[in-house]
Amino acid sequence: MKEQNLNKMISAQHDPELYDIISRFLEQDVHAADQLSVTERHLCVLSALMGCQGKEAFMAELHEAMKDGVDPIAIREAVYQAAAYLGLGRILPFLHMADALMQEHGLSLPLPPQGTTNDDDRFEKGLDKQVQLFGEGMRKQQSEAPQPRRNINRWLAANCFGDYYTRNGLNDAQRELVTSCLILAQGGCENQLRGHTAGNLGVGNDAAKLYGAVEQCMPYIG
């Protein structure tokens, strides 16, 4: 993270020792080991900061992502994707920050639409995407799951996958990386993280890339 953005989080004047420690760790250790593309790194960090509710750090990272040329649509898609995994109550501050900063950078809102489904096909297309990423077992869950699970399973296909995973703006590999960082940063979601680790491997994010994503998130989530 560049000096001016780090200083928005930690005052070099008031807390010079912590500033130096964090700056050294980020620049000499974490960034030096970076295996991700610029876009991947920023999307991973932004997603982790949403997951851990790191509002001040998110704003600083967002400034840096915009200056580094990350596509605003990709940033917006990461924020929208977070709605499925964090819930509306936790993503609103980040949505508002992203909108405000994009306008600061001269962008006109709303950005071009990226949705590909409608009321009639969101369930079917979402279920197809689920099966594509996680296997035929996802289809069986719609008919064979215990009755109390049926609503949640249907919503998972229609909303999480039909409304979000089918969108343009991020490819499957980027979207799975974003999702894993959102889950990782919340803590206590190991079962979900295992499932999405398999999902990442299935879309071509190999073990080295997943380790790289965790490394870039680590300074922000511990």
Language-model features: where?
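Glycine/small-residue-rich hydrophobic helix-like segments
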Residues: 171-208
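Acidic, glycine/proline-rich low-complexity segments that act as flexible tails and inter-domain linkers
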Residues: 1-39, 51-52, 56-63, 67, ...
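Short, structured motif recognition centered on aromatic/hydrophobic residues
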Residues: 40-49, 78-79, 175-184, 213-217
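Winged helix-turn-helix DNA-binding recognition segment
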Residues: 70-74
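Alpha-helical bundle segments that constitute or directly flank the non-heme di-iron/ferroxidase center
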Residues: 45-56, 188
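Substrate/cofactor-recognition hotspot
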Residues: 77, 83-89
